[in-house]
Each structure stands twice: as C-alpha cells, then as structure tokens.
Amino acid sequence: MKVTLIAILTCAAVLVLHTTAAEELEAESQLMEVGMPDTELAAVDEERLFECSVSCEIEKEGNEDCKKKKCKGGWKCKFNMCVKV
C-alpha cells in the first residue's frame, strides 16, 4: 500500500514539474518570436519613462522625494527618470 502511494505521489510530482517547465518554455518561445519587432518593446519602455517622469514631477511639487516612487514592472523612479531595477 505504501509503495503504491509513494509511486502515485512521485508520478504526480513529476507531472507537475513537467507541466510547469512546458509552460515556461512556451512563454519563452512566444517572447522570442522572430516576428515580434523590438519597436513594441521600445514603446513600452518609453511609456514607462513618461509615466515615471510625470509621477516624479507630481511628487516634487508636493515636496516629497522622487526616489521613493517605484514604477511598475521592475522599474524604479530615480533622478526624474525610470531606471530598470
């Protein structure tokens, strides 16, 4: 009985790990598609830079330190610009 239970749990763990790895591989392949131009990524970066600059200006007018503000997606507001963290 114990051996059967251990075998079932082992198979379930392997299945979960395999599924997770397959999902990561699929996500990476979608990101690395040849047809996806770099201009789309540049547009996102420019949008984050703009959002951060506006946020910093609002905070400066309120006499707060701009460096405390964090941008979304791994970006940080520093010196009135968005920088990758």
UniProtKB/Swiss-Prot annotation:
GO cellular component annotations of the record: extracellular region; host cell postsynaptic membrane
Keywords recorded for this protein, A-Z: Disulfide bond, Neurotoxin, Postsynaptic neurotoxin, Secreted, Signal, Toxin
GO molecular function, one term: toxin activity
Paired cysteines (S-S): 52-66, 56-77, 71-82
Expression by tissue: Expressed by the venom gland.
Signal peptide positions (record): 1-22
Propeptide boundaries: 23-48
Primary role: Postsynaptic neurotoxin.
Name by which UniProt lists this protein: U4-theraphotoxin-Hhn1t
Organism: Cyriopagopus hainanus
